[in-house]
Curated annotation (Swiss-Prot):
DNA-binding region: 140-234
Name of the featured protein: Transcriptional regulatory protein CseB
InterPro entries (alphabetical): CheY-like_superfamily, CseB, OmpR/PhoB-type_DNA-bd, Sig_transdc_resp-reg_C-effctor, Sig_transdc_resp-reg_receiver, WalR-like, WH-like_DNA-bd_sf
Any one Gene Ontology cellular component term annotated for this protein: protein-DNA complex
Cystine bridges: none
Gene: cseB
NCBIfam families: resp_reg_CseB (NF041733)
Domain Response regulatory: 6-119
Lineage: Bacteria, Bacillati, Actinomycetota, Actinomycetes, Kitasatosporales
Amino acid sequence: MADQTHVLFVEDDDVIREATQLALERDGFAVTAMPDGLSGLESFRADRPDIALLDVMLPGLDGVSLCRRIRDESTVPVIMLSARADSIDVVLGLEAGADDYVTKPFDGAVLVARIRAVLRRFGHAGGGDRTEGAGAAETGGVLTFGDLEVDTDGMEVRRAGRPVGLTPTEMRLLLEFSSAPGTVLSRDKLLERVWDYGWGGDTRVVDVHVQRLRTKIGQDRIETVRGFGYKLKA
């Protein structure tokens, strides 16, 4: 298992859980599959997987709450699985700290592609609790925007001299904005550059992550340009 990417898959439907586990294992992943949120949390704490796939509707501890508990302890990437793309549960999952979501029923190849895309963003095919990413800002050094400091070498952020804890996805998003302060970046462009989507994606993923980033670096630091996208105030 040490040489494989370890996936924690939490799904209460026996058929989906077993079929998906087999499909992922055929693609070379090591999979721990659990049937409910509480056992999923125990497995996460014991095994420290490289990525977690969480169904939204879970018995005992629902997927959104499980995501929140995981995010309190780790920056490991999380993908939520939802039966409805328009469900408020998708937004709640993203707000709880999920990095992406996949709508059920899903094609196995699509799920594998999404997992690999998330892992590429995190800069590893394995490994757990670190905050890192292949940055959009190629130049090293510290970028300063008012009381906000972005260290593109150390992948660290400070606000008014105090460390700001960001997930790898939030860090990549901030690096993208920092590489072009004052430039409007469309949601589609951010999906392409930050989420590594080679196809159309749900722009709500961008919106929720921008809001999460704002709560950490300042609500007025990232400006919404209606009809176009977002920009970092220079």
